Amino acid sequence: MPPLSESEFLALAEAELTRIENIVETAADEADADIEVNRTGNVLTLEFDDGSKIIINSQAPMQELWVAARAGGFHFRRGDDGRWVDTRSKEELYVALSRYISQQSDVDVTLAAG
């Protein structure tokens, strides 16, 4: 997939961060997990009862979404199929986020990408 222009990437990343925000809020409610979701610009912060956080933000120069969680730091790039995948493990973004959120909330949370 050829690189996007910066404005194309920013629009795509903005839409994806909004989508993640909505999906996390819905999944947390369904799982009865206490997760505070806050968005400031291109940074989405998930805060848990124990004070830990997951931070998701867009990195326009790299055309990636970066995730910082207790499990580590991860970079996700959009593939030809439109899915965001980890640049190292190739794990899909929503599968990975489900695991990170479940680990930090001590509640089984599954994010539905669709």
Swiss-Prot record:
Keyword presence, Chloroplast: no
One BP annotation, GO: iron-sulfur cluster assembly
Superkingdom as given in the UniProt entry: Bacteria
Statement: the UniProt record of this protein carries the keyword tRNA processing: no
A GO term from the CC aspect: cytosol
GO MF, one example: ferrous iron binding
Pfam family, one: Frataxin_Cyay
Role this protein plays: Involved in iron-sulfur (Fe-S) cluster assembly. May act as a regulator of Fe-S biogenesis.
Family assignment from sequence similarity: Belongs to the frataxin family.
PANTHER family: FRATAXIN, FRATAXIN, MITOCHONDRIAL
Descriptive protein name: Iron-sulfur cluster assembly protein CyaY
Natural source organism: Ralstonia pickettii (strain 12J)
